[in-house]
């Protein structure tokens, strides 16, 4: 960390950054192959910078659902330009997409939670399973503060369904922490954030949030807040005890 950058951070955030760098390095060393699932939104651009600027051996991929905003897809180019890194993209199986559209309609996800989750499974979960088929661990940019569905998030977990470790290194970071980091390190960010989109998913399923709403209120806004997950993180998860998490950063 440069002196100029260090002075731009509060002591508390500087300590979080130091711990984050140490944790990512240890994750990369601990497992033969690790991948980071990036949505190309703010938290994930933070982790992209932390990984690539330090040369941590963690691969980065994104799920190109076929229905992302142009601004989100543009972040792949910005990462290439800034870091010289090509983010790996995983796409849904076209035959599964075609069957869903033929049976239910292109935008059937508005009709019920079941049809929405089915669409998410085809466009996100199945590609994620392929992306993680050959890894020992994966990393996410999830934070506890984001929504009620993530309030119990642990920094280190065991993804029992896939038989691999799962890390959420930003679990205890606040939104203010994230944006202070992005500003201090001049990290490129999705322009949709400036238009009121703190959480960004597929274009037809994401809207800008209103004052006072939580950061994920714009995702699947027509549903109850308790159902707002796409299935990427809804698997059998075993939290790692807090003392083990603390040890992982040393």
From Swiss-Prot:
Top-rank taxon, per record: Bacteria
Positions of the catalytic residues: 230 (nucleophile)
EC number: 1.8.4.10
SUPFAM superfamilies: Adenine nucleotide alpha hydrolases-like (SSF52402)
InterPro entries: APS_reductase (IPR011798), PAPS/APS_Rdtase (IPR004511), PAPS_reduct_dom (IPR002500), Rossmann-like_a/b/a_fold (IPR014729)
Comment on bound cofactor: Binds 1 [4Fe-4S] cluster per subunit.
Cofactor dependency: [4Fe-4S] cluster
Localisation per UniProt entry: Cytoplasm
Keyword set includes Metal-binding: yes
Cellular component per GO, a single term: cytoplasm
Pfam families from the UniProt entry: PAPS_reduct
Record-level GO BP terms: cysteine biosynthetic process; hydrogen sulfide biosynthetic process; sulfate assimilation, phosphoadenylyl sulfate reduction by phosphoadenylyl-sulfate reductase (thioredoxin)
Alphabetical UniProt keywords: Cytoplasm, Iron, Iron-sulfur, Metal-binding, Oxidoreductase
Residues that bind [4Fe-4S] cluster: 119-120, 202, 205
Catalytic reaction equation(s): [thioredoxin]-disulfide + sulfite + AMP + 2 H(+) = adenosine 5'-phosphosulfate + [thioredoxin]-dithiol
Uppermost EC category: oxidoreductase
NCBIfam families with a match to the protein in the record: APS_reductase, PRK02090.1
Known function: Catalyzes the formation of sulfite from adenosine 5'-phosphosulfate (APS) using thioredoxin as an electron donor.
HAMAP family found in the cross-reference section: CysH
Family to which this protein belongs: Belongs to the PAPS reductase family. CysH subfamily.
PANTHER family: 5'-ADENYLYLSULFATE REDUCTASE 1, CHLOROPLASTIC, 5'-ADENYLYLSULFATE REDUCTASE 3, CHLOROPLASTIC
Protein name per its UniProtKB record: Adenosine 5'-phosphosulfate reductase
Gene source species: Burkholderia cepacia
